[in-house]
Design a protein with these regions (language model features):
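Solvent-exposed beta-hairpin/edge-strand motifs
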Residues: 24, 80-110, 168-185, 461-487, ...
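Long hydrophobic segments that form regular secondary structure
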Residues: 411-511
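Secretory-pathway-linked proteins and extracytosolic
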Residues: 22-28, 148-160, 164-308, 424, ...
Length: 631
């Protein structure tokens, strides 16, 4: 389910009310030096003025002034806006200024590229896009535009002017004007600013200001932006949307409205009901019935995104999903819910955000979720079903939802629950590598790997590809020059969590370097990503997920050698994980064993030295070679 795009904005009615010196804000040399250091662009002004005229009508004006310092910042000067049924882009003006603040070019609404075409099959959103650039840097662009909603709205645009990396903010202003008796709620995250509130005739005006916000330098294992960036969310306590009305004063009230949208959407034709019973009536176990219907859903339907009808919030009726053989996350989840209900199994419609793990418990807004799954309560353990991708085993909690908060619908409303996540030790890679090196130094390699749980997710569906598509994927995993892949075998194993077995053979004439008396052998055949930390750590260290990697490498040699040099045996443990490595020579066979475990979680920035040392030790290991001397 697409995030509701009721946002984005319009012309500020009076530019002088937003900043007192328009010329200054357009000149590059007037920027504080602190805002220019290490960035590609500076938001000089991000001013939003939203007026809720009534529950059906809202106008949002926006003025965005961006100084682009170099080519990396050019994208931040482009204009993009989305509208949908019930909203429209009314005005647009873009002006380009040189470094001294002199006007060089003006564009308007007639220059826009507006398209309703998208990758989705059914979508009533329109994308409006326009690029405005200069061949010389720096330059400044001022955009002014207006979006109106005339048939109700469910969200009020947020105030989120700050960027995580690369872009600093000089000044952000947000003004919300409402009738005196209009009720709304707001939630500030990562900020303590309070609004300035005034009464102007019959209207209430609330104003928020953010100033001088510097971005962070890109660093390893940065926390999720939503947990760091200051932003404010808004929602109307009551709303009218697509000819329906509801309340958003709490999740319980919002849940009642969404629950009403689900009623009557679980209908099945008699033929479809008969099919459900033909699949399940001979299956004695409840869980096996669920698995059978889950598999049937995947075999008989395919996923498409559908953003029509009530802004994409109401699912397609279950009988239509089965008849047409298509559905989005809402429709497919609701369809499986209907089939389960037909055979006496109750389930819950669930909304979750695949990008942001958190849902604010004290602010109910549709924009906080963007996806729908299904929950089947069970005494033996609840099943969470991803209906858009049945290549996942039934009940498997994939990485885009594991540990996220979700809205679970039951008994006429909704409540927040946290979706479980798996322990790090369940995410595993087990690798066995056998290498034969001939007298000319050519390497012949056989690899057998097993990927389990989260580590298997990137490989699901790979078995359906042709070998021509599989080869570059495998080569991208390897650090082997002049690698020729000879054979590939991929198997997806039917277990409770994703399990993929991958084996292949390859060869290389120069993976090993050789001279008359010595061989220089890398410590690993695999590409190993290194964590690059800044010299000074500003934020806590957040490792998104953990895993265990076990690797055993056996190398058969053509002649007798002795080990002249190698990476020392390693055994390291820290708050971020552990690493052990040993290398030995037995006759003409080298045995190298490595086990690395990474622990997910958030560590205080004061631990950066310990964690940096841990990842640095691993990087140092991969960079070393085993040096053998011919006897």
């Amino acid at each position: 389910m697409k995030r509701i795009l009721t946002t984005i904005a319009a012309i500020v009615l009076c530019a002088s009310a937003s900043f007192s010196q328009p010329k200054r804000i357009l000149q590059t040399f007037t920027m504080p030096d602190s805002l220019k250091q290490g960035v590609c662009a500076v938001i000089r002004l991000d001013s939003t003025a939203t007026e809720c005229h009534s529950l059906k009508s809202m106008t949002t004006g926006h003025m965005l002034v961006v100084t682009v310092l170099n080519s990396e910042g050019a994208d931040y000067g482009h204009f993009i806006e989305y509208t949908s049924e019930g909203s429209s882009l009314r005005q647009l003006k873009g002006t380009l200024y040189d470094a001294s603040g002199e006007k060089r070019r003006t564009v308007g609404k007639g220059d826009l590229i507006s398209t309703e075409q998208s990758a989705e099959m059914a979508d009533d959103y329109t994308t409006h896009y326009l690029e405005l650039t200069s061949p010389t840097y720096p330059y400044t662009i001022c955009w002014e535009w207006e979006v109106t909603h005339s048939d109700g709205y469910i969200s009020i645009p947020p105030f989120a002017p700050a960027h995580y990396v690369g872009v600093s903010l000089e000044r952000g202003v947000y003004t919300l004007t409402t009738p005196k008796d209009y009720k709304f709620s707001f939630k500030g995250a990562n900020t303590s600013i309070e609004p300035q509130v005034s009464l102007q005739k019959e209207k209430k005006v609330s104003k928020w200001v953010m100033e001088g916000i510097l971005p962070y330098r890109k660093d390893a294992f940065m926390p999720h932006p939503q947990s760091i960036l200051p932003h404010i969310l808004f929602t109307p306590d009551e709303f009218i949307y697509h000819k329906t009305s509801g309340k958003a004063s709490s999740w319980e009230e919002y849940g009642k409205w969404q629950w009403a949208l689900l009623q009557g959407r679980d209908s099945l034709s008699q033929e479809q009901k008969d099919l459900v019973h033909s699949i399940t009536d001979t299956i004695p176990l409840r869980r096996e019935k669920i698995k059978a219907l889950y598999r049937h859903l995947g075999q008989s339907t395919r996923y498409v995104s559908i953003q029509l009808g009530l802004g994409g919030l109401q699912p397609m009726a279950a009988h239509k999903v089965l008849s047409y053989g298509i559905g989005d996350c809402k429709g497919l989840s609701n369809c499986l819910k209907a089939m389960l209900k037909e055979c006496g199994i109750e389930s819950n419609y669930v909304e979750v955000n695949t990008n942001n793990p958190a849902i604010h418990p004290d602010l109910a807004s549709a924009s906080q979720t963007n996806h729908v799954i299904l929950k089947v309560p069970d005494p033996a353990g609840d099943l969470w079903l991803e209906c858009t991708n049945t290549s996942y085993p039934p009940g498997y909690i994939h990485s885009n939802i594991a540990g996220h908060h979700a809205l679970v619908y039951a008994n006429g409303t909704a409540a927040i629950e946290k979706i479980p996540s798996y322990p790090d030790t369940m995410n595993r890679i087990i690798s066995k590598v056998h290498i034969r090196i001939d007298q000319a130094g050519h390497s012949y390699i056989k690899v057998e790997e097993k990927y389990v749980n989260r580590c298997a997710e990137p490989f699901l569906g790979m078995a359906t590809l042709g070998i021509r598509e599989q080869k570059p994927l495998i080569q991208g995993m390897l650090s082997i020059p002049s690698c020729t892949i000879d054979s590939i075998s991929i198997k997806e194993i039917a277990t409770q969590v994703p399990t993929v077995e991958l084996s292949y053979t390859c060869s290389s004439p120069n993976w090993v370097q050789a001279n008359a008396n010595r061989l220089f052998i890398p410590t690993t055949i695999f590409n190993q990503a290194s964590a690059k930390f800044n010299r000074t750590r500003k934020l806590d260290i957040e490792i998104p997920y953990g895993y265990v990697w076990e690797n055993a490498m056996t190398i058969d040699l053509a002649d007798d050698y002795t080990i002249e040099a190698k990476a020392g045996d390693i055994s390291i443990t820290c708050c971020a994980g552990s690493l052990t490595h040993t290398t030995s020579l037995q006759g003409r066979t080298i045995l190298a064993k490595t086990e690395r475990s990474i622990l997910s979680g958030r560590n205080p920035k004061e631990k950066v030295g310990e964690i940096k040392g841990f990842f640095g030790a691993a990087a140092g290991l991969w960079g070393k070679k085993i040096i053998l001397k011919r006897q």
